[in-house]
From Swiss-Prot:
Pfam families: dsrm (PF00035), Ribonucleas_3_3 (PF14622)
Origin organism lineage: Bacteria, Pseudomonadati, Pseudomonadota, Alphaproteobacteria, Rickettsiales
Keyword Ribonucleoprotein recorded: no
Organism, scientific name: Ehrlichia ruminantium (strain Welgevonden)
Enzymatic class: hydrolase
Keywords, comma-separated and alphabetical: Cytoplasm, Endonuclease, Hydrolase, Magnesium, Metal-binding, mRNA processing, Nuclease, RNA-binding, rRNA processing, rRNA-binding, tRNA processing
Documented EC number(s): 3.1.26.3
Subunit-level organization: Homodimer.
Database matches in CDD domains: DSRM_RNAse_III_family (cd10845), RIBOc (cd00593)
Family: Belongs to the ribonuclease III family.
Protein name listed in UniProt: Ribonuclease 3
Length: 227
């Protein structure tokens, strides 16, 4: 059974297996009884729980870090790349319930699907077992990475903002100029503008990713070398 297989991997047994089923159900699967029976609502909750637990984890692991350094570390631990890495480490994609069409298009390996399902899984664990259960799960898969973070990682948006400040420019501005694709797999196009430099735009499966890509393009445009 799927429930037993995934429970062994995540080291958690669900009391309410319906929550697990909901967390693993892709929006492409239409329910006759409830069109909201998919992972989107649990994803919303799981995102908040993950951010809370990671923030507390870093606060305790690094008692002498500044707020800025803690924020940079948290960003690296909750970013899409990290979520996909963890989702792949537990083979989450094979457990996601999706339409035949979505699966045939590579849905089981789609980064956006993996991110969303992992956050939904955290939300489901939180509702089923409380904050302690959610903490145990997050600590199991995130603590090693958090503990070994030495230098605060630099993300493109932060670097671009610091560069702008060093030049006396206003902070870079980001605007969504287009959104396409279905609700369960959207594609955002974001434009970045900074002082008198020409605007550049980039696309991504979520707003944050598109902003990071746009910032990276702007850094390349101004010939900034990321250390």
């Amino acid at each position: 059974m799927i429930t037993n297989a995934i429970s062994k991997i995540i080291k958690y047994d669900f009391k309410n297996t319906q929550l697990l089923n909901e967390a693993l159900t892709h929006p492409s699967v239409l329910s006759k009884d409830n069109n909201n029976f998919n992972y989107e609502r649990l994803e919303f909750l799981g995102d908040a729980v993950l951010n809370l637990v990671i923030s507390e984890m870093l606060f305790n692991i690094f008692p002498y870090d500044t707020e800025g350094n803690l924020a940079k570390k948290k960003t690296a631990l909750v970013c899409g790349t990290k979520l996909v890495e963890i989702a792949q480490s537990i083979n989450l994609g094979i457990f996601i319930i999706m339409s035949d069409g979505e699966r045939s298009c590579g849905g089981a390996n789609n980064s956006n699907n993996l991110e969303n399902a992992l956050e939904a899984l955290i939300g489901a664990i939180y509702l089923d077992g409380g904050l302690k259960a959610a903490k145990d799960f997050i600590f199991l898969f995130w603590k090693n990475s958090a503990t070994h973070m030495k230098v605060p990682p630099q993300d493109a948006k932060t670097i671009l903002q610091e560069w702008a400040q060093s030049k006396g420019f206003p902070a870079p501005s980001y605007h969504i100029i287009n959104k396409s694709g279905p609700d369960h797999n959207p594609c955002f196009t974001v434009e970045v503008r900074i002082n008198s430099h020409e605007t550049l735009h980039a696309t991504g499966h979520n707003k944050k990713l598109a902003e990071q890509k746009a910032a990276s393009l702007m850094l390349a445009k101004i010939n900034y070398k990321i250390k």
